[in-house]
A protein has these predicted regions:
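Extended, charged alpha-helical coiled-coil/arm scaffolds that mediate oligomerization and mechanical coupling
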Residues: 45, 74, 85-153
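Noncatalytic partner-interaction/assembly domains of nucleic-acid and motor enzyme complexes
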Residues: 1-111
Length: 154
């Protein structure tokens, strides 16, 4: 990475917010998202925390709205870790359309896969630049296995 021109990993704050806002506004949208996303797919740490709180509430058949999510978050995190109640309200207010939540979720997931590929690529490049106790065929096998693990998630 060039210090003068750092590359930001692929992400979309808008898509992440739209997924979260859609879930806050219409809990039934969970059915469209549950098999697409996990909290690890979110780039923003605050969005991971919010998503985990929503999931916890919905899995326990509790409503997930800005108040209940905030209360769930503060059970294990500082409220400031998600930008506070105001940020939750902004997410809900700025959600463009709940009906497109599946498309937003797929976009968030796709960007997550790109980030995973970048991470693996960097790991493989680092290992190839200084191959400590690893044969080239072993590195190829390791690379193939890691990429296959990502492919299985799709």
């Amino acid at each position: 990475m060039d210090i003068d021109n750092p590359k930001i990993p692929p992400n979309s704050v808008d898509s992440e917010q739209s997924v979260l806002g859609g879930l806050l506004l219409h809990n039934e949208s969970w059915d469209s998202v549950v098999n697409i996303l996990s909290s690890d797919d979110f780039y923003q740490t605050s969005h991971r925390i919010i998503y985990d709180a929503i999931v916890t509430l919905l899995e326990h058949d509790k409503p997930a709205d800005i108040l209940t999510v905030k209360e769930q978050v503060i059970k294990s995190h500082d409220e400031d870790s998600i930008g506070g109640f105001t940020y939750l309200a902004q997410i809900a207010e700025n959600t463009p359309s709940v009906s497109n939540i599946e498309a937003y979720a797929k976009h968030v997931r796709e960007l997550s896969i790109y980030r995973q590929l970048i991470k693996i690529g960097k790991e493989m490049a680092d290992t190839a630049f200084s191959p400590k106790d690893i044969e080239v065929n072993d590195l190829l096998d390791l690379s193939e296995r890691k990429i296959f693990e990502i492919a299985e998630q799709v």
